Amino acid sequence: MPELPVPAEEAEPRPAVARPPEPLALSINGKPYFHDGDPAMPLLWFLRDVLRLTGTKYACGVGSCGACNVLLGGKLATACTTTMAAAAGHDVTTIEGLSSGELHPLQQAWIEEDVVLCGYCQSGQIMAAADLLRRKPRPREEDLAGIAALCRCGSYPRIRRAILRAAKTLRDDAR
């Protein structure tokens, strides 16, 4: 009978997951939350797996596609590369928290411009657009070229029109 392999005794044991000394506090869509798990956990998994906020999508996992875009402290961030430790103490806004009750002007413009094809990138696109309009309420065409989310379906012309429509709506509503 052959011998069963035995793990090498000199193999390094795996380190235990570092736990924060106290739970990490953050606000998500205006509600307070605490995380007492691994501080290196990506914010994306906390949103999707713990809170079941599945509007923020997983795609590339390295922060380059924009499917997981959220607002962190009011600024655009990729949830797949933002750790819970980095998110602690900040306000996080996901697509679910972009508006309360009625559609946000960006969401309405997305519908009116018939932007959605497959829809997978749309929450990331909308969050990137929200960040852009916060910084530039009157975006120019060149501002729209650098929108921070990739779209496999090629909806970019419709996305640009929707952002310009939403910008006008937001300006008109501010009057």
Predicted regions and their residues:
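Signature of N-terminal electron-transfer/Fe-S-associated modules in redox systems
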Residues: 1-175
